[in-house]
Amino acid sequence: MPDSSLSNKGISKNFKIMLVILFLMEFARGMYVLSYVNYLPTVTSIAVAVTSAALSIHFISDAATNFVIGFLLKKFGTKLVLTLGFLLAFISLFLVIWFPTNPIVIILSAIMLGIAVSPIWVIMLSSVEEAQRGKQMGYVYFAWLLGLLVGWAFMNVLVKLHPTRFAFMMSLVVVIAWVLYYFVDIKLTNYNTKPVSEQLGQIVDVMKRHLVLFPGILLQGASISALLPILPTYATKVVGVSTIEYTIAIAIGGAGCAFSMLFLSKIIDKNSKGFMYAVIFTGFILFTAFIFGLSLVTNILIVWIVAIFIGLMYGILLPAWNTFMAGQIDPAEQEETWGVFNSVQGFGSMIGPLFGGLIAQFSNGLNNTFYFSAAIFLVLAIFYGVYFVKYRGKANRF
């Protein structure tokens, strides 16, 4: 079978299938987590507290699994771990068919789905070719974003036709991804059977060696997710738009991000490290300005314009940032390291909505959440701007 990375001539068949599998798993996640669970309180007797708990626990289980999944992949092999992952995802969404509004099932399914999607991510990130990392990262994150958004939109249509009748579609998507898995050949960097104590020590060692990356990994997710609890209220109460116009703004931002990931991210591979550093620093500065600007905007047309610029910038910032992270990773520990990185990123995405919601509630103002989010990106710009200058200064001396 072809190697699961890009060849010199383009994307291998193996890598294409893996991208489709990632897309389908995120499609299923978008259907369930972003659409189905959020829609339940509006059409059934299930409480908002239950669905909120399901969402939080889903991301907690995802982050916790990411922390150890790299070690599990190397200890037990990809075939066993991925097969169990697909089985767990299928069971989680199959239960929803029979118990569509049962609170225990809703929460349990969210936990199982969070665990199930983790190994796909780690394998995709660790199988990317170094020479074309920016381009390949663009494809990986495009598959992720497109899967989530299309799954969310598709399920929104289905639940409007009937709240629960089409729940079977979610497990069907997982089955398709599962079948496709048997057409790929996945190879890890190496296999080992280290004892648990040694693996825990390796996790600590990974964290110590990559401390400089942790502020960016943790705080980017926290800054962006902090806006999630207040964006719907901001759109309807401050800007005064309908749900459809708000959805269009999200779609415009997503389209800009997708375009940038597909067509602009590849320029990272064709330029120097200095260019990559400039993209990251400029991205943080522009995010600071754009997010702060949203607190001043009350016109939907301007919101749409800002949304597309945010999407375009994020679509090139994310591959640049991941290329920067990848340059710090020991090639023999890719699966373990990406697992830890994804776990830290997931933790940031968990605490962001908590801080964003609390700031808006206790300060009695949505703008303060925007200021909080913008301030985080400003801190990141200063921190990494100083780091990049010092790093280039050291490099020039040798």
UniProtKB/Swiss-Prot annotation:
Gene3D superfamilies tied to this protein: MFS general substrate transporter like domains (1.20.1250.20)
GO terms classed as biological process: lipid transport; lipoteichoic acid biosynthetic process
CDD domains found in the cross-reference section: MFS_MdtG_SLC18_like
MF-aspect GO terms: antiporter activity
Pathway: Cell wall biogenesis; lipoteichoic acid biosynthesis
Known role: Proton-coupled antiporter flippase that catalyzes the translocation, from the inner to the outer leaflet of the cell membrane, of the lipid-linked disaccharide (anchor-LLD) that anchors lipoteichoic acids (LTA) to the cell membrane.
Name listed for the protein in its UniProt record: Proton-coupled antiporter flippase LtaA
Source organism (scientific name): Staphylococcus haemolyticus (strain JCSC1435)
Encoding gene, per UniProt annotation: ltaA
